[in-house]
Amino acid sequence: MSEKACRHCHYITSEDRCPVCGSRDLSEEWFDLVIIVDVENSEIAKKIGAKVPGKYAIRVR
C-alpha cells in the first residue's frame, strides 16, 4: 500500500482518509518529508502547522 499525503494538512498516511484532519483529498504525488516528534517544541512543526507527531510532506501536488 502506497503512502499518500493530505492536500490540506500534508500529513502522510497509508489510509483512505487523513487521520489528522479527516480529509479524503489525498495525493500520491508528494515530495520531501519531515518527521515531527515533539510538536510543542519544534520550530519546524510550528512553521508547517503540524498539530500531531508524524510524517509530513513538504510539497503535495
UniProtKB/Swiss-Prot annotation:
It comes from the Archaea. GO terms for molecular function: zinc ion binding. InterPro entries: RPABC4/Spt4, Spt4/RpoE2_Znf, Spt4_arch, Spt4_dom_sf. Zn(2+) binds at residues 6, 9, 18, 21. GO terms for biological process: regulation of DNA-templated transcription. Keywords: Metal-binding, Transcription, Transcription regulation, Zinc. The keyword Iron does not apply. SMART domains: Spt4. Stimulates transcription elongation. Contains a N-terminal zinc-binding domain and a C-terminal NGN-binding domain. Heterodimer composed of Spt4 and Spt5. Belongs to the archaeal Spt4 family. This is Transcription elongation factor Spt4. It comes from Pyrococcus furiosus (strain ATCC 43587 / DSM 3638 / JCM 8422 / Vc1). The gene is spt4.
